[in-house]
UniProtKB/Swiss-Prot annotation:
Its main location: membrane. It is a multi-pass membrane protein. The chain crosses the membrane at residues 19-39, 92-112, 124-144, 161-181, 196-216. It comes from the Archaea. Keywords: Cell membrane, Membrane, Transmembrane, Transmembrane helix. Pfam families: NADHdeh_related. InterPro entries: NiFe-hyd_3_EhaH_prd. It is found in: Cell membrane. GO terms for cellular component: plasma membrane. It comes from Methanocaldococcus jannaschii (strain ATCC 43067 / DSM 2661 / JAL-1 / JCM 10045 / NBRC 100440) (Methanococcus jannaschii). This is Uncharacterized protein MJ0522.
């Protein structure tokens, strides 16, 4: 099953309990995250022209230098965490990367001086913190049932992990802010400052695909 999903495995790089695997699937996700991180580092933020209510003239929204530095740094952290999540083949380490991406997503919009953006990020932050319970809880239950968290070893163990997979998927949904939790995150995307905001989309998309690959593998 693992070969049919991930493609050919070129090799692994172990760092103690942390194991990075280089397969066709993981390399594509890793390169995508790295390329977009470089684009974020080199690109200046967009300038938005907002229509004003009961006014003829439009308002030009410009990202200040201090705001730019914070958001660029958090977008780069988000990209690095996403790239790491693409390569790791340890379930606990993947959960750590997933949590770090959720924190970075909040950090990307934390410097925006708009009440509705900060309210949305606060609500998303609450959901992300709650989602860590099923995320790490499912990893703990898998470890207790199988004795390992290695994505290479779990497919070899003949044990039903359906309940643990469902809980892990629920934790991932909360961390990435997809349905049914998208409502708390939607307003964050209206904040000015692309491509930093697009990093939230990209990281969520890559992590969803990676989680599906992991759940089908184990």
């Amino acid at each position: 099953m693992i070969e049919s999903i991930t493609g050919y495995l070129f090799g692994i790089v172990p760092f103690g309990d942390i194991v990075f695997g280089f397969s066709e699937f993981s390399i594509i996700g890793f390169i995508t995250a790295v390329i977009f991180t470089i684009i974020v580092y080199l690109t200046k933020p967009e300038k938005q022209l907002e229509a004003q209510k009961f006014k003829i003239e439009d308002k030009l929204e410009v990202v200040t230098l201090n705001e730019l530095k914070i958001r660029r740094m958090m977008a780069i952290v988000c990209g690095i965490a996403t790239a790491g999540a693409m390569l790791t083949y340890d379930l606990f380490d993947y959960a750590l990367f997933l949590t770090l991406v959720g924190i970075a997503n909040i950090g990307i919009v934390s410097a925006v001086k708009r009440e509705w953006v900060l309210n949305a990020s606060y609500q998303y932050g609450l959901i992300a913190m709650i989602a860590t319970l099923p995320l790490f809880g499912s990893a703990g239950m898998i470890l207790a049932k199988t004795g390992t968290l290695s994505i290479f070893e779990l497919p070899k163990i003949q044990t039903s992990l359906l309940f643990e997979k469902i809980i892990f998927a629920a934790g991932m949904a909360g961390e990435t802010g997809i349905a049914p939790f998208y409502a708390a995150k939607a307003e964050m995307f209206r904040a000015p400052g692309s491509p930093y905001i697009l990093m939230i989309h990209l990281s969520s998309l890559l992590l969803i695909v990676r989680t599906v690959e992991i759940l089908l593998t184990i």
